């Protein structure tokens, strides 16, 4: 095994610097010392997202659960689950510290100021006006989505999804006792996904009651245009299919792209046929704070969902989320271009170092959807998966990447029809770690 791969993550965290990438690629900044960084990971008055912030031992899923699965010595870079590895916004920490000083944790009322902060964020960042009276708070996007599915679908009926799509939706279908109805998208020659409109409409059979829209699309990174969303909405309205819009990644819009909220569409009837679910948990990496919300312009539809929904508030989650909405904008405004450059760097560096891997820069999210079908062919992933009793070629690829490159990526098969031959890589991490992951993989594939 190469010296590169033998350098484990803990040694890497202690390293003083990494070599900058030459040529036209984005540079990888040296890892600053604590003294250089200053308090809270701030360097020269700016948030330093190149800082390698050690999350080990906090019980986090992205790193610690992978150590439990594969052994800590076998993971240099965890790039699976969709949360970020950066220090959070100082505003969130300050608000939590202030609340914790009050040492009582009884039942709490939801404050109007929190709803107001949600309305303000949507208005100022996305030009979307949301009636505060229609906003309902939940513990995460899954909870209202399951409630909505139970509200509009009979057990055993179908739910339409454009695939590849977020793997968590399939669990939501299980808990709502509904059936999968995948409409596979297609890739053009540039690697961009598009909806197969003929198939999309054909799958709107009388027993299909709902369509789960992922906007932007996880894992492919599509930022859906108004034209696309209108066509989806028109077909759903025509066929009696309710649109359930998961827009949790909506703040991560890459340069030159645009996020169009489904609720902003110009046709009232189309918008009234929908429920939107959102959270700021991706934006500020607050997944464990368990706070989200949903809304609809259709009061009757909203009442049906509310009837099926139950979620109490998390007091610290509300504090953290409101602090993010009101005081975290500077942090996020610095983070967003950093994520955009991570995508640029990954696309260029993969092209340079990994001829067997294809990646087209995502239009949104901090996720990279990698075409690793050529790698699968080179290592005979399908046969090896079958011989070892694994679920799919991409499950074998996940294990192979850990064994040979010490990186963990999510298997593509979990993202529905069309996921085979792909892996999802999380780019919400310091650029030096992205470089290390690609270098490790390049070294491993040099022997194939």
Protein language model regions, located:
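Conserved glycine-rich beta-strand-loop-beta hairpin in the small C-terminal domain of fold type I
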Residues: 339-347, 359-375, 381-384, 419
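Active-site phosphate-binding strand-loop segment of PLP-dependent enzymes
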Residues: 187-257
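N-terminal small-domain helix-loop-helix segment of the aminotransferase-like
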Residues: 41-140, 147, 326-327, 447-448
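N-terminal secretory signal peptides and thylakoid transit peptides that target proteins
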Residues: 1-21
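PLP-dependent aminotransferase-like
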Residues: 45, 150-213
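Helix C-cap/helix->beta junction micro-motif
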Residues: 176, 238-239, 405
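PLP-dependent enzyme catalytic core of the Aspartate aminotransferase-like
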Residues: 383, 390-396, 400-448
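PLP-dependent aminotransferase class I/II
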Residues: 273-352, 357-364
């Amino acid at each position: 095994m190469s010296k590169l791969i033998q350098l484990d993550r803990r040694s890497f965290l202690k390293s003083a610097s990494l070599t900058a990438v030459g040529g036209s690629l984005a540079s990888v900044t040296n890892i600053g010392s604590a003294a250089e960084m200053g308090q809270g990971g701030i360097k020269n008055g700016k948030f330093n997202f190149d800082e390698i912030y050690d999350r080990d031992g906090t019980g986090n899923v992205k790193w610690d659960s992978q150590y439990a699965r594969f052994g800590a010595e076998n993971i240099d870079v965890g790039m699976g689950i969709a949360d970020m590895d950066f220090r959070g916004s100082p505003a969130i920490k300050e608000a939590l510290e202030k609340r914790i000083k009050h040492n009582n944790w009884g039942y709490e009322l939801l404050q109007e100021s929190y709803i107001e902060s949600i309305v303000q964020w949507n208005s100022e960042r996305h030009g979307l006006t949301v009636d505060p009276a229609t906003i309902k708070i939940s513990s995460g996007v899954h909870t209202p989505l399951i409630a909505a599915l139970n509200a509009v679908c009979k057990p055993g009926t179908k739910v339409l999804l454009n695939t590849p799509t977020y793997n968590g939706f399939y669990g939501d279908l299980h808990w709502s006792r509904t059936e999968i109805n995948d409409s596979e998208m297609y890739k053009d020659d540039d690697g961009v996904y598009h909806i197969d409109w003929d198939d999309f409409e054909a799958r709107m059979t009388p027993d299909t009651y709902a369509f789960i829209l992922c906007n932007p699309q996880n894992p492919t990174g599509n930022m859906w245009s108004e034209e696309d969303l209108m066509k989806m909405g028109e077909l759903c309205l025509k066929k009696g299919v309710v649109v359930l819009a998961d827009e949790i990644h909506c703040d991560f819009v890459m340069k030159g792209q645009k996020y169009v909220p489904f609720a902003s569409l110009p046709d009232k009837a189309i918008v009234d046929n929908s429920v939107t679910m959102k959270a700021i948990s991706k934006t500020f990496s607050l997944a464990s704070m368990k706070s989200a919300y949903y809304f609809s312009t259709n009061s009757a539809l909203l009442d049906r969902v509310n009837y099926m929904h139950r979620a109490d508030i998390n007091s610290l989650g509300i504090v953290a989320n409101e602090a993010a909405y009101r005081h975290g904008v500077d942090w996020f405004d610095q983070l967003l271009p950093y994520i955009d450059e991570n995508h640029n760097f990954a696309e260029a560096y993969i092209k340079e170092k990994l001829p067997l891997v294809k990646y087209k820069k995502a239009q949104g999210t901090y996720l990279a959807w990698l075409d690793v079908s050529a790698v699968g062919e080179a290592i005979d992933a399908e046969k090896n998966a079958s011989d070892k009793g694994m679920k799919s070629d991409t499950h074998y690829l996940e294990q192979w990447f850990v064994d040979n490159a010490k990186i963990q990526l999510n298997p593509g098969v979990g993202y529905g029809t069309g996921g085979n031959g792909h892996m999802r890589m999380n780019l919400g991490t310091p650029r030096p770690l992205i470089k290390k992951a690609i270098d490790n993989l390049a070294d491993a594939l040099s022997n194939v």
